[in-house]
């Protein structure tokens, strides 16, 4: 017993079974305090709940529980202030904090806290606590970004730009419609976080190393103390599963992809060739050698960091794919991808929101390009269909019109009445009624379309959905 305490003083939770300490090489490989210290506050919260569970089973007296909690509170304050930190000899956050507890409560009382729990159920629980907290932060920052995009959409209710497929001019659309198309994936990301929390809201505490405990501890008591709705149904699954972690990292990667797609457009729109936007000075950078440069660094970094987020997911899944039940030390490698994904999003999202909120759109340039590239060709084909021309024929006639215009350096509205008639008698002068981008946009008034009234309804629906999701998080 005393030998075990001696090893605990060194920041390790094992040792008596071994004749000597680990080699320096093993200690260096095994150490994790340089990254798992991020879980210190959650470890202390778990220790308080575990102490209460031990007291409920009679393993701590009321006085011992009070002394234990007081020591944990002092340790918590010292961790927060920086007065206590992990030492080089500490293997991980758990060992470091047990050392800190024993320094404050004494070896006899401090050494009792480990009864009935293992690092296996402990770490599985702490990661969920960490992720649930940070999921809330990420959700708030996602909402702020959606609000910034929606505000730009609301500020530009009539601006038209060329909609694109394959990066080619396709059909004119409202800028607001295009911007809102970037909001909905982010709303689904919010919904994914909310749905993920149903599975994360389960505590693995009480599973011990893998088989549970003989001490009669109540896992549900600890779960509720820590804010979980339930405890694990299976102690092996609780300690060994990391699908909840992988799911979170997937959501983070998906958010990164959604940001990256918008970032790519902002980068293009900011070029002189497009000329659709100007970045605010406070959200762009210059060049160390070219005085004229104004670079879209936030968009580029968001695009780059999406690859990092995808890499975190790929690395984590690769680590998990070959592990037999139950716990394996490989699972130590789940922390850094998780922490990195969280930290990346928590930095990228507010920067991206600020960039979007301060974008200045060049609506005249968008209006200039909107009818170009024969973007009204589909309107011509559908105008013919409304006159009972089979769509196959209408498609071919419109294709002939486009070829003629292209060969003669004309846009569709520049083709003369005589030239229309020469292409086909079906192309009467009335075809000009559909050769305006305003008319094209207004005519697409079906549900989900780009007509102004539909976009206004869409904006209201988006706002309601986001406010509902925000309210659910506050419950």
Curated annotation (Swiss-Prot):
It catalyses: 2-(N(omega)-L-arginino)succinate = fumarate + L-arginine. GO terms for biological process: arginine biosynthetic process via ornithine; L-arginine biosynthetic process. GO terms for cellular component: cytosol. GO terms for molecular function: argininosuccinate lyase activity. PROSITE patterns: FUMARATE_LYASES. Its EC number is 4.3.2.1. InterPro entries: Arg_succ_lyase_C, Argininosuccinate_lyase, Fumarase/histidase_N, Fumarate_lyase_CS, Fumarate_lyase_fam, Fumarate_lyase_N, L-Aspartase-like. CDD domains: Argininosuccinate_lyase (cd01359). Keywords: Amino-acid biosynthesis, Arginine biosynthesis, Cytoplasm, Lyase. It holds the Pfam family ASL_C2. It is found in: Cytoplasm. Pathway: Amino-acid biosynthesis; L-arginine biosynthesis; L-arginine from L-ornithine and carbamoyl phosphate: step 3/3. Belongs to the lyase 1 family. Argininosuccinate lyase subfamily. This is Argininosuccinate lyase. The gene is argH.
């Amino acid at each position: 017993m005393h030998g075990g305490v001696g090893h605990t003083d060194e920041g390790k939770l094992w040792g008596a079974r071994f004749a000597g300490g680990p080699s320096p090489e093993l200690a260096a490989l095994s150490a994790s305090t340089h990254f798992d210290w991020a879980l210190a506050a959650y470890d202390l919260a778990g220790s308080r709940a575990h102490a209460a569970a031990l007291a409920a089973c009679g393993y701590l007296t009321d006085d011992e529980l009070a002394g234990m909690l007081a020591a944990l509170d002092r340790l918590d304050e010292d961790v927060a202030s920086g007065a206590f930190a992990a030492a080089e000899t500490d293997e991980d956050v758990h060992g470091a904090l047990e050392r800190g507890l024993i320094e404050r409560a004494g070896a006899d009382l401090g050494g009792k806290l480990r009864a009935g729990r293992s690092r296996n159920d402990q770490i599985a629980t702490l990661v969920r606590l960490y992720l649930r907290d940070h999921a809330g932060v990420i959700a708030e920052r996602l909402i702020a970004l959606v609000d910034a995009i929606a505000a730009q959409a609301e500020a530009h209710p009539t601006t038209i730009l060329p909609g694109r497929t394959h990066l080619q001019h396709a059909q004119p659309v409202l800028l607001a419609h295009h911007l809102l198309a970037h909001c909905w994936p982010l709303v689904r990301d919010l919904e994914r976080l909310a749905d993920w929390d149903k599975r994360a809201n389960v505590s693995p505490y009480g599973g011990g190393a893998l088989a549970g405990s003989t001490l009669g501890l109540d896992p549900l008591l600890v779960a509720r103390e820590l804010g979980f709705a339930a405890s694990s149904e299976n102690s092996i699954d609780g300690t060994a599963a990391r699908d909840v972690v992988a799911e979170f990292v997937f959501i983070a990667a998906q958010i990164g992809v959604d940001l990256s797609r918008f970032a790519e457009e902002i980068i293009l729109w900011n070029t002189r060739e497009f000329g659709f936007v100007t970045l605010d000075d406070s959200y762009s950078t210059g060049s160390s050698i070219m005085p004229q440069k104004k670079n879209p660094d936030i968009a580029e970094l968001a695009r780059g960091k999406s690859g990092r987020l995808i890499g975190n997911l790929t690395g984590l899944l690769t680590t998990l794919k070959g592990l037999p039940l139950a716990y394996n030390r490989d699972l130590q490698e789940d922390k850094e991808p998780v922490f990195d994904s969280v930290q990346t999003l928590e930095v990228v999202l507010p920067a991206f929101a600020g960039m979007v909120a301060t974008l200045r759109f060049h609506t005249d340039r968008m209006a200039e390009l909107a009818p170009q590239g024969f973007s009204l060709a589909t309107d011509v084909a559908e105008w013919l269909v409304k006159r009972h021309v089979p769509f196959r024929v209408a498609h071919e006639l419109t294709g002939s019109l486009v070829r003629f215009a292209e060969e003669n350096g004309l846009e569709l509205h520049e083709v003369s009445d005589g030239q229309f008639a020469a292409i086909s008698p079906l192309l009467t002068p009335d075809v000009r009624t559909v050769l305006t981008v305003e008319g094209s946009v207004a005519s697409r008034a079906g549900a989900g379309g780009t007509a102004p009234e539909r976009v206004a309804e869409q904006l209201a629906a988006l706002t309601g959905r986001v406010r509902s999701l925000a309210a659910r998080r506050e419950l």
